[in-house]
């Protein structure tokens, strides 16, 4: 049997033939020279110097050559790739310089033009409305409380009497935080500001009178009336002898100071795990004052001619929540409420679309915000 032939003929491996390597290099250099914009040069870089470029694929085939032939082929391919990369670098520097020169010409500032006042910034309307809402309750003797936005499930659900099978505890409603290993961590993006109720009861001496403005998160699609990120103003009172009448009075005072004197409020029975009894709070429409009800000739867009506008939920704090926070339910009672800050802004300023609040358009901020 004759011995195997280990000699290397570069013609047998077409991508590594000297002429083929030179052709690939020349094609790359020609494409680089023709690139007239940085975007075109980016495409040339991918095509002629990327991981799937002809020279890169040829470089991978060097390992299949006989050992004696690898060094020569490696120098040849490596030299070609080096030339291509150096040409890319030089062309990019040239195009960047040309782009900068073009921008300087196109965006030249004529210093001889008359001076215009520089537009002043404005605080976001959500910030100003949240502070205004909180200030009303601070005027009643409440304190501001805050809590983390990444919250433990115990504070967000268990301590607030959410049963394990409650729909809110599913991924369809809640953003769950994965641990470092990708498994469950027991943490969520808080779905409401109510966890701060429990934290306030655990951290403060009784009695507790707090309001909690803050950002919350739910898996809602962004549309005209919903957003996955929204803001709430939570209120909590826990003291001796507290009744639903005190809650009704606080809500009434808030509505009158926020929307106008003489507006009526009402409560409709509802259900929340952390309050019992629970209620939805409506206020009399501050535009039509009920005059549009049953009057097709004078419809009201604000209340849809119903005469009432829903503004939030409330109720007497469920004893189980107080027990979870270590409060003596024989001695203390309390109530809580939750108001939507975006919803309040929509009513106060006639904002129709949630997109306007979250997309960061400075024109919206300038129109409804407070100038700095």
UniProtKB/Swiss-Prot annotation:
Keywords: Aminoacyl-tRNA synthetase, ATP-binding, Cytoplasm, Ligase, Magnesium, Metal-binding, Nucleotide-binding, Protein biosynthesis. Mg(2+) binds at residue 276. The keyword Ligase applies. Gene3D superfamilies: Bira Bifunctional Protein, Domain 2. GO terms for molecular function: ATP binding; magnesium ion binding; phenylalanine-tRNA ligase activity; tRNA binding. GO terms for cellular component: cytoplasm. Its EC number is 6.1.1.20. Its cofactor is Mg(2+). It holds the Pfam family tRNA-synt_2d. Binds 2 magnesium ions per tetramer. Its main location: cytoplasm. It catalyses: tRNA(Phe) + L-phenylalanine + ATP = L-phenylalanyl-tRNA(Phe) + AMP + diphosphate + H(+). This is Phenylalanine--tRNA ligase alpha subunit. It comes from Thermobifida fusca (strain YX). The gene is pheS.
